[in-house]
Amino acid sequence: METKGYHSLPEGLDMERRWGQVSQAVERSSLGPTERTDENNYMEIVNVSCVSGAIPNNSTQGSSKEKQELLPCLQQDNNRPGILTSDIKTELESKELSATVAESMGLYMDSVRDADYSYEQQNQQGSMSPAKIYQNVEQLVKFYKGNGHRPSTLSCVNTPLRSFMSDSGSSVNGGVMRAVVKSPIMCHEKSPSVCSPLNMTSSVCSPAGINSVSSTTASFGSFPVHSPITQGTPLTCSPNVENRGSRSHSPAHASNVGSPLSSPLSSMKSSISSPPSHCSVKSPVSSPNNVTLRSSVSSPANINNSRCSVSSPSNTNNRSTLSSPAASTVGSICSPVNNAFSYTASGTSAGSSTLRDVVPSPDTQEKGAQEVPFPKTEEVESAISNGVTGQLNIVQYIKPEPDGAFSSSCLGGNSKINSDSSFSVPIKQESTKHSCSGTSFKGNPTVNPFPFMDGSYFSFMDDKDYYSLSGILGPPVPGFDGNCEGSGFPVGIKQEPDDGSYYPEASIPSSAIVGVNSGGQSFHYRIGAQGTISLSRSARDQSFQHLSSFPPVNTLVESWKSHGDLSSRRSDGYPVLEYIPENVSSSTLRSVSTGSSRPSKICLVCGDEASGCHYGVVTCGSCKVFFKRAVEGQHNYLCAGRNDCIIDKIRRKNCPACRLQKCLQAGMNLGARKSKKLGKLKGIHEEQPQQQQPPPPPPPPQSPEEGTTYIAPAKEPSVNTALVPQLSTISRALTPSPVMVLENIEPEIVYAGYDSSKPDTAENLLSTLNRLAGKQMIQVVKWAKVLPGFKNLPLEDQITLIQYSWMCLSSFALSWRSYKHTNSQFLYFAPDLVFNEEKMHQSAMYELCQGMHQISLQFVRLQLTFEEYTIMKVLLLLSTIPKDGLKSQAAFEEMRTNYIKELRKMVTKCPNNSGQSWQRFYQLTKLLDSMHDLVSDLLEFCFYTFRESHALKVEFPAMLVEIISDQLPKVESGNAKPLYFHRK
């Protein structure tokens, strides 16, 4: 005797349109574990009943283990009204109907099994005639008609039961052609009942006996709900949802659905996983041949637990499994509005490619059976929109993944997947243009998850900005006027709250630092392979950072007066300064004490992990000691090779001569000292508190339960005695001078990318120098953009000044590097490109190299300081203008006059120039005048190689091509006007 258990799940009214949202009521019929025989071993009845209402929070209609949470991707508004208006039958009547259908299906399954067995016996002799199968179906129909007891309340046109059988002659190599059925809602001509399960049985079997489809439907009241295998649409549903029917695929696409195995020898219950189509994921492949499975992967609506049989691993593509996108579109979930187990409705798909695939059969046509077309979905090209809401609601593919959490697979929504969900594997949403997020179904506007990736704010990341002066310069930013309210950050980047830190660049990661210059400043340029430079911060944040970060002195005074008990506050382990306001964070104290961001961790000599900045260069401890011993010991090392040995962590001790040469090329100098930012302010912090205050007593013992470090309170200074002189000193220290600004914005030395393996021909050397000049010009443009006062000029004047002075700036910087790194013995173009006498001759510009070398020797004679060099460099930027003048000539004259005054002031402050300041100022200005004569010769040679670049095989980067193309006609026409200090 069979024992049948029914498990009811809640289900909404509009199952067709709200398949993925409403709760479901699925009744399953299962046999007792002790009474399974060969006849009922694979029998399963799936009846679906509809229950009105939305999703209840606490449902009591079924076991809680049978509930299935809805997918976040398919979640919709629960307040949408249902579309059915018919009355709903009680659940008791549904159970009685299910029991009747179960008994009826037993006879039907026996009939189909007999047909399958007969095929196995006749398969060796030939194909089985479909007449016998057709007669079995007619007998079943008569049986159902005789046992009909409940008419349907739906009024529709009666349609005879039709089945379509394909001929065995159309099978090639065992491949069976496709058998299709138009709709599972098929009624007998003489029966007044419509959509009753007694009139709804359709059996489709191909002559090869592999593909057979059975479907069962149930009519509850006036709303027929079908099994997911033969999903249909009643007449009361929306007209834009087409009737669905069972689809029996060929062996290359699908397996038997809802039918027993064609051969009892390969019967089994375990599901298999097919590599081509991922039919099931619960168990491994059991047999490469005919396998019958019991699918364990349910649909999102939890009603697709139907029986499937698979012919071969390559054919395991049935409806009840989640198949891969490449193998099938039947198992893919199409839309939360349209049924998840049926094809897309042709009436609602705009632009979708839907074809009618009809397979002709001679034998069937002889028997009078009509061919019923079935929509064959080839490819979904556009999203299917609901006729009511117009929302995009396609999730094209559901892909089983072996790992990962399901909650991270879909976007949007607050729904969670219950542990009792019938999905046994996570579902991954494919990143296609039809993919959906939770916000799409709720009608919310789509939000860009990456708002800062606008593209217009990253001017340095565009191709036009790599080689465009106007693109790099951009609109003006807050300059030297001390405007603290300027928006240094672009609109597309989130601004961090100002915590009063003096140096925002202290938060830049050390990976962004390329190195330090001879003065010790760290710069945060990233240099790419093509010579392009991208900043770690936005390019529009390159204005003078000190001005926008220093709070005004009067603001500090007001904050100090408002906090009387300055000494009673506690810091986070750092000493408390008497006059530091309370709102200054510990990060400010760290930035003041350190003075600059942490240097890079890579040694610039051998590539080992750097221990700090030694002798002006970020190096490791080994190279530091080696350089000190080599220079102080005055060793004369000789290279056994060609002075191009590889110096790295492993081979740095092989050749001391090449190692010392690389140390010099990196800029190591025994006299170099790393300058600290706000060094004067640091000295004030270290000296004045110690002079005015007695040493504090030792801190009290720390309690074991407390984790704070106690700082002894310092004596509060008197407002009339101590605070006033300190305020005057602080105000002077917090007011940055232009010289301090120029020191901090000085760019880093770039590498030329010189390939020592190539011969040192004139073509190779000149091409390398041009590429280096292109990289340096990008730095010059970025340096000019943050130059105090330069952004006050119109953009046209900025571009004109850079175009006229680029050669002068490059040669002057070359002389400075040669002076600092080689004491003007060589031309220090880059750390990897140093010209000696031999390379000067090989470059075909020996006389020009000698002229630049003479400028470097003048630096040695004058013992030029870094402060003087930075101001003179700005004056060279402002030393050549058009004959007709600039667009804003008054602003240009004012800026140039201010920097001349700064140079005069710097010369006067220098202690070595006491009594001789005017003489030194004269020498420095004469040196600036001599640069014009050298630059005129350099430009003449550059223009010649630029014209004959193809013949000479000399390469020019795009930045130089733009500058030279604009500058060449102006210079040759005599439009350039150099500005001299000592000439008329």
UniProtKB/Swiss-Prot annotation:
The record lists the effect of residue 785 to E as: Loss of coactivator binding
List the biased-composition ranges (Polar residues): 231-243, 292-329
Residues holding 21-hydroxyprogesterone: 770, 776, 817, 945
Write down the InterPro entries for this protein, in alphabetical order.
Answer: NHR-like_dom_sf, Nucl_hrmn_rcpt_lig-bd, Nuclear_hormone_rcpt_NR3, Znf_hrmn_rcpt, Znf_NHR/GATA
Q: Offer one Pfam family short name for this entry.
A: Hormone_recep
Task: Return the GO cellular component terms, semicolon-separated.
Answer: chromatin; cytosol; endoplasmic reticulum membrane; nucleoplasm; nucleus; receptor complex
The impact of changing residue 810 to L is:
In EOHSEP; alters receptor specificity and leads to constitutive activation
Q: Where are the zinc fingers (NR C4-type)?
A: 603-623, 639-663
The UniProt keyword set, sorted, is: Cytoplasm, Disease variant, DNA-binding, Endoplasmic reticulum, Lipid-binding, Membrane, Metal-binding, Nucleus, Phosphoprotein, Receptor, Steroid-binding, Transcription, Transcription regulation, Zinc, Zinc-finger
The GO biological-process annotations, alphabetized, read as: nuclear receptor-mediated steroid hormone signaling pathway; positive regulation of non-canonical NF-kappaB signal transduction; regulation of transcription by RNA polymerase II; signal transduction
Q: Which CDD domains match?
A: NR_DBD_GR_PR, NR_LBD_MR
Supply the name of the protein. Answer: Mineralocorticoid receptor
